[in-house]
């Protein structure tokens, strides 16, 4: 599983850099683990150069253990009885005339806890779109709806991969609502008021010298997961950190054993992000080209039909960070009171930062985000 988490981590950072580079004032939020597991399921049916390109894009090198690795990883991360809630909606929707192989369907279920559902895009496109959206909404407890916008599928659609994920967790050290107050958040362009939460407690903290960036680890209850935040110094642009970022550096900067636990004053904005991506252009940039091309796609391990390309890869992700943790909660009145001593180190996220949610046991990056626009 270590090799797999290494592959997923490398893929996570590559995709993160591509998603974020177009406009560095835009927020980014996605789940690399759920995207790579969804694509690995498709990879199971790929052959020839389609498979070679997918393996390169996903940093997976094809051997029999990949799918078993994902099986272990998914059951570890999604297991019941955890103090966090993770709802993943992963499913392939295929045009029913494409004659999908029973073995492939069985393996989707066995390794990825996912189904290939056959629909008739050719006969009733809009009905199929609504059916897919309803299914995702149900799977994510209503937090994620409309994963496919109007017009995103058509009668020629052959294969749609839908991947949505919703996470809810409570902080190990909750922020006290009575200290939350309006505070300015500085972006490159302007200053905006955000609801800034405050907590003084012992947290693991470090400093990445080469990019002049503070590193803070905020654990969730029972410390199975934690949020790791990379906050550049006031005079360092976040773009500098992003440019230098690789998976190797991420591991070095955020290595739990290298961080020191000490009392620190943490200022963190409440945030709520919902991001949707049509991943095709980004996956093409990572070298996955043939899968989307009707003349070249080879998914003969999935269907007896020739030329069944991936028509759409849709990913939608929702996160809310508040005093209790990452979950939706009712708002209460805020008492403005900012009494706090100035002696402890400060970690004040009042300008753009990167954040990652990591699963400790597997060292897997579940989510990657950039908060740069309140």
From Swiss-Prot:
Keyword field: Cytoplasm, Protease inhibitor, Serine protease inhibitor
GO biological process: epithelial cell-cell adhesion; negative regulation of endopeptidase activity
GO CC list: collagen-containing extracellular matrix; cytoplasm; cytosol; extracellular exosome; extracellular space
GO molecular function list: serine-type endopeptidase inhibitor activity
InterPro entries: Serpin_CS (IPR023795), Serpin_dom (IPR023796), Serpin_fam (IPR000215), Serpin_sf (IPR036186), Serpin_sf_1 (IPR042178), Serpin_sf_2 (IPR042185)
Disulfide bonds: none
Domain of life: Eukaryota
Gene3D superfamilies found in the cross-reference section: Alpha-1-antitrypsin, domain 1 (2.30.39.10), Antithrombin, subunit I, domain 2 (3.30.497.10)
Site label Reactive bond, positions: 339-340
Family note: Belongs to the serpin family. Ov-serpin subfamily.
PANTHER family documented for this protein: SERINE PROTEASE INHIBITOR, SERPIN, SERPIN B8
Role of this protein: Has an important role in epithelial desmosome-mediated cell-cell adhesion.
Disease per UniProt entry: Peeling skin syndrome 5: A form of peeling skin syndrome, a genodermatosis characterized by generalized, continuous shedding of the outer layers of the epidermis. Two main PSS subtypes have been suggested. Patients with non-inflammatory PSS (type A) manifest white scaling, with painless and easy removal of the skin, irritation when in contact with water, dust and sand, and no history of erythema, pruritis or atopy. Inflammatory PSS (type B) is associated with generalized erythema, pruritus and atopy.
Protein name as annotated: Serpin B8
Phylogenetic lineage: Eukaryota, Metazoa, Chordata, Craniata, Vertebrata
Gene that this polypeptide is encoded by: SERPINB8
């Amino acid at each position: 599983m270590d090799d797999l988490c290494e592959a997923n981590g490398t893929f996570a950072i590559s995709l993160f850099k591509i998603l974020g580079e177009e406009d560095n004032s835009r927020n980014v939020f996605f789940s690399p683990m759920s995207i790579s597991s969804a694509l690995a399921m498709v990879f199971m049916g790929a052959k020839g150069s389609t498979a070679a390109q997918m393996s390169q894009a996903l940093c997976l090198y094809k051997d029999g253990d990949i799918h078993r690795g994902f099986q272990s990883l998914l059951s570890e991360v999604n297991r019941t009885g955890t103090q966090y809630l993770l709802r993943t909606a992963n499913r392939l929707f295929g045009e029913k005339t494409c004659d999908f192989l029973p073995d492939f369907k069985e393996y989707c279920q066995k390794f990825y806890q996912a189904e290939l559902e056959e629909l008739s895009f050719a006969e009733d496109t809009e009905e199929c779109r609504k059916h897919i959206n309803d299914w995702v909404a149900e799977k994510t407890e209503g937090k994620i709806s409309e994963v496919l916008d109007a017009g995103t599928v058509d009668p020629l659609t052959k294969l749609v991969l839908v991947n949505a994920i919703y996470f809810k967790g409570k902080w190990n050290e909750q922020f006290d609502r009575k200290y939350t107050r309006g505070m300015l958040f500085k972006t490159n362009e302007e200053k905006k008021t955000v609801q800034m939460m405050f907590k003084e407690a012992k947290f693991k903290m470090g400093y990445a010298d080469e990019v002049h960036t503070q590193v803070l680890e905020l654990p969730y209850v029972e410390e199975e997961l934690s949020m790791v935040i990379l906050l550049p110094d006031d005079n360092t642009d976040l773009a500098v950190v992003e440019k230098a970022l690789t998976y190797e550096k991420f591991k070095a900067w955020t290595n739990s054993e290298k961080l020191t636990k000490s009392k620190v004053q943490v200022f963190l904005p409440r945030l709520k992000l919902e991001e949707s991506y049509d991943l095709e252009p980004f996956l093409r940039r990572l070298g996955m080209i043939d899968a989307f091309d009707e003349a070249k796609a080879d998914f003969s391990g999935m269907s007896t039909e020739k030329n069944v390309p991936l028509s759409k890869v849709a990913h939608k992700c929702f996160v809310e960070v508040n005093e209790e943790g990452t979950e939706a909660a009712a708002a209460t009145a805020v008492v403005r009171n900012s009494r706090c001593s100035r002696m402890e180190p400060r970690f004040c996220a009042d300008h753009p930062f990167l954040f990652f949610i990591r699963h400790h046991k597997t060292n897997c990056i579940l989510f990657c985000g950039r908060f740069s626009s309140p």
